């Protein structure tokens, strides 16, 4: 698909190799991933002013924690850090493919066409429900070296970016679920409280 992760990775320049970390589970991840009900997930993230080695090391620790949890995306608020930073890797099987690091991302355009697809979240483990989102997006962001970038994405990449960007605004995917009966059932089965959902659907 256009804007696929493999295509984006091929277009990236070699400096992104600085973000490569082993795509394996650690016995103890460096960062704790907060779960639904933790108020930290509901606080909006702040823009990052200066992109430096501290920011890059945070991104690496987020990746290590994400790989340990077997996820494909993670936003800084999920680990209790209210900065506009997210990491994505849709190619977990290929150790040489660099992950995508988005700093201060902004969606500049979204398709009129919508798509329904099942989503899950490391902050709501075990819960999987359909969410409607734009099929394709355009966005601007800074990369891990602080350089301004623009990008087009569709399919799973577009969905993953939108899902992770929601976290920067204190929104979780369950807030966008329209099937309230299914939502109630899934949350109850996995030990979460319906009252912790803040519907925006």
Swiss-Prot record:
It catalyses: N-terminal N-formyl-L-methionyl-[peptide] + H2O = N-terminal L-methionyl-[peptide] + formate. Its cofactor is Fe(2+). It comes from the Bacteria. The active site is at residue 164. One of its GO terms (molecular function) is peptide deformylase activity. Gene3D superfamilies: Peptide deformylase. It is an enzyme of class 3 (hydrolase). Pfam families: Pep_deformylase (PF01327). InterPro entries: Peptide_deformylase, Peptide_deformylase_sf. Its EC number is 3.5.1.88. Keywords: Hydrolase, Iron, Metal-binding, Protein biosynthesis. Binds 1 Fe(2+) ion. GO terms for biological process: co-translational protein modification; translation. Fe cation binds at residues 121, 163, 167. Removes the formyl group from the N-terminal Met of newly synthesized proteins. Requires at least a dipeptide for an efficient rate of reaction. N-terminal L-methionine is a prerequisite for activity but the enzyme has broad specificity at other positions. Belongs to the polypeptide deformylase family. HAMAP family: Pep_deformylase. This is Peptide deformylase.
């Amino acid at each position: 698909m256009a804007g696929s992760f493999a295509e984006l990775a091929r277009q990236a320049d070699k400096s992104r190799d600085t973000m490569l970390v082993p795509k394996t589970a650690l016995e103890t991840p460096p960062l704790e991933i907060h779960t639904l009900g933790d108020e930290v997930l509901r606080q909006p993230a702040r823009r990052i002013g200066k992109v430096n080695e501290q920011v890059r090391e945070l991104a690496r620790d987020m990746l290590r924690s994400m790989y340990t949890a077997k996820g494909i995306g993670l936003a800084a608020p999920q680990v209790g850090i209210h900065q506009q930073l997210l990491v994505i890797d849709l190619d977990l099987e290929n150790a040489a493919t660099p992950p995508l690091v988005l700093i201060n991302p902004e969606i500049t355009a979204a398709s009129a066409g919508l798509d329904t697809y099942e989503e899950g979240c490391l902050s709501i483990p075990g819960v999987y429900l359909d969410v409607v989102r734009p099929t394709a997006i355009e966005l601007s962001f800074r990369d891990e070296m602080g350089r301004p970038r623009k990008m087009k994405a569709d399919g799973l990449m577009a969905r993953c970016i939108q899902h992770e960007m929601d976290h920067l605004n204190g929104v979780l995917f369950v807030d966008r679920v329209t099937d309230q009966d299914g939502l109630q059932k899934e949350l109850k089965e996995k030990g979460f409280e319906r009252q912790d959902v803040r519907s925006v659907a």
